[in-house]
Amino acid sequence: MAVISMKQLLEAGVHFGHQTRRWNPKMAPYIFTDRNGIYIIDLQKTVKKVEEAYNFIKQLAAEGETVLFVGTKKQAQEAVQEEAERCGMFYVNQRWLGGMLTNFQTIRRRIDRLQELEKMEENGSLEVLPKKEVAELMHEKEKLQKFLGGIKEMRRLPGALFVIDPRKERIAVAEARKLGIPIVAIVDTNCDPDEVDYVIPGNDDAIRAVRLLTAKMADAVLEGKQGEQLAE
């Protein structure tokens, strides 16, 4: 049983690449043709590549490793958060803060601060403080929650990154590469596939395309976790 069908990919518009004047020649092997100045991605290749990525993520999750979902562009934010939460993984969907991987200890301290503020809110210790101070602390908490909420429970570096648009998320990609963390990514016709370990050639701009492929990776995590439980 194929992980994904041509029909699903077509219906979600995964085959539409970027304009022909905005392309990376390294993506040539994944391009089927061009139509009205737009590259059309070879979906037969995408089907194969989705399967490879799916099996890799599934195996990773079965070994108890984690996946960090990264997509900060408008079209990706919602799918990234919802699908990562659905499979119990971590996500960054607002802004990649430099050092999120390479300076993880410092980021962890910011997360500890977020958790400290949450505790203060829960146990009522804010109630004794002046209103102005409470407002400042709440503002700090909201800001930390916005940028770090998706990695709050991440105690160590992830086993892999799943990235939507490695060109937009180039800082995340560079950090993962520096640390030898494998990268799975939706790679459009204007991206460099050499930066990515598991390339999924596809449209990274259409909400439906992003949602479909992100959901598939979340499914892989869930299937892998099931395997991990069975192994126990």
Swiss-Prot record:
Signal peptide coordinates: none
Q: Is the Iron keyword given for this protein?
A: no
Enumerate the transmembrane spans: none
GO MF: structural constituent of ribosome
- Keywords, comma-separated and alphabetical: Ribonucleoprotein, Ribosomal protein
Instruction: Report which superkingdom the organism of origin falls in.
Output: Bacteria
Please give the PROSITE patterns that the UniProt record associates with this protein.
RIBOSOMAL_S2_1 (PS00962), RIBOSOMAL_S2_2 (PS00963)
Q: GO:BP terms for this protein?
A: translation
**Cross-referenced Gene3D superfamilies:** Glucose-6-phosphate isomerase like protein, domain 1 (3.40.50.10490), Helix hairpin bin (1.10.287.610)
CC terms in the record's Gene Ontology section:
cytosolic small ribosomal subunit
Family the entry assigns: Belongs to the universal ribosomal protein uS2 family.
**Protein name listed in UniProt:** Small ribosomal subunit protein uS2
Naturally occurring in which organism (per UniProt) = Pelotomaculum thermopropionicum (strain DSM 13744 / JCM 10971 / SI)
